[in-house]
Amino acid sequence: MRHYEVMIILDPNQDERTVTPSLDKFLEAIRKDGGKVEKVDVWGKRRLAYPINKKEEGIYAVVELECESHSVLELDRRLNLNDSILRTKVLRTDSK
């Protein structure tokens, strides 16, 4: 299994208190495949470097997880299908 870090930018109109529960729905796919979610860090609302879908701000969240590559690809696919998610970035990190 490999370590990954996923940066997610969500729609700023979403309530920040609902970010973690809504991300848990997507992260359940990682847990079902035998991976584990190590940390979910919600940074809150921040200004974007450039507008995305005519939005100047976004809610940033960083998720650290350990899973197989096919699991993280499925997670990224599901996140990109959701309208409330503006952008995602998946990075493979070094083992801890």
From Swiss-Prot:
Family: Belongs to the bacterial ribosomal protein bS6 family.
GO MF assignments: small ribosomal subunit rRNA binding; structural constituent of ribosome
Function: Binds together with bS18 to 16S ribosomal RNA.
Superkingdom of the organism of origin: Bacteria
Gene3D superfamilies, per database record: 3.30.70.60
Keyword Cytoplasm (UniProt): no
PANTHER family: MITOCHONDRIAL 28S RIBOSOMAL PROTEIN S6 (PTHR21011), SMALL RIBOSOMAL SUBUNIT PROTEIN BS6M (PTHR21011:SF1)
Underlying gene: rpsF
Coiled-coil residues: none
Entry keyword RNA-binding: yes
Biological process according to GO: translation
Pfam families: Ribosomal_S6 (PF01250)
Protein name per the record: Small ribosomal subunit protein bS6
Keyword field: Ribonucleoprotein, Ribosomal protein, RNA-binding, rRNA-binding
GO CC field: cytoplasm; ribonucleoprotein complex; ribosome
